[in-house]
Amino acid sequence: MKRDEIDRLLREKTRMWERRIKDEDLFEVVEEVFDTATVKTVLELMRRKILRKLNGVISTGKESRVYLAYGFSGEPLAVKIYLTSSAEFRKSIYKYITGDPRFEKIRFKDTRSLIIAWAHKEFRNLKRMYEAGVKVPKPVACLDNILVMEFLGEENARYPLLVEAYKELTSEELKYLFQLTCEELKKIVCKAELVHGDYSEYNIMIKPDLDIVIIDVSQAVELSHPNALEFLIRDIENIYRFFVKEAKLDIHREQIWSKIEPCLKEKGVQSS
């Protein structure tokens, strides 16, 4: 069989599967993120029995959409689909990849290949943090531009972010959350040996029992990254600013630094 004939049959097979997906209502929402390549990736995740059904959007951003999904055992999952056509996003992520030894040998021929690498970077960061005991969603799988992880929420709704929930909390509860936030930052740096890079009230979920979950770790870099200290200082400033200006707590930067500085010195990272 000639190559052209093989390609034609593959295209027909893909179109047939796409129609079947829509006909069987495996997708409840079809948006611009579902280009042909992304549909193929979703199909492959279904073939591997990782996903059974995609539901509605949990959250949206400039670079991705997160959907509620279900696995073959009925377990709820969060599916993050990165947009592969965002040129602006491509520019914004270079500073996190340049200097990362995990990407030294990778060559990005186009925006899609870069975004795929970015999705896999988040999966690896999630796995590393999860194994280090950081409170993050459990990573399940990553294929092309799609990341599958544990869903954290109730009744098909994700847990609220710190920025969404803090106004309903007491001063004592906010003090408790500040301590938890510092402890998780310490675990990210000292146990996972990473810097989050965007540690803020927008990337911390609050559970009903006031436990926290750290999300959006794609930009996290290793401590050896040339900009690691700069990113860490920014993370600390983000937390300090929020708990002082928004939560109105009487705290000091040193309360955050004191938890991290000893292990930075131990790992040979100069903090000043």
Predicted regions and their residues:
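Conserved ATP-binding subdomain of kinase catalytic cores across diverse folds
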Residues: 31-159
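Conserved kinase catalytic-core helix
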Residues: 110-138, 142-143, 158-197, 202, ...
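Short glycine/proline- and charge-enriched loop/turn segments
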Residues: 103-109, 157-168, 214-222
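C-lobe/activation-segment region of protein kinase-like
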Residues: 170-181, 190-196, 207-272
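A glycine-rich phosphate-binding loop feature that marks nucleotide/adenosyl-phosphate handling sites
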Residues: 145, 203, 259-261
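N-terminal, Lys/Arg-enriched amphipathic/low-complexity engagement segments
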Residues: 15-35, 44-45
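Short, glycine/acidic-enriched loop or turn micro-motifs at the edges of active sites
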Residues: 83, 153, 201, 206, ...
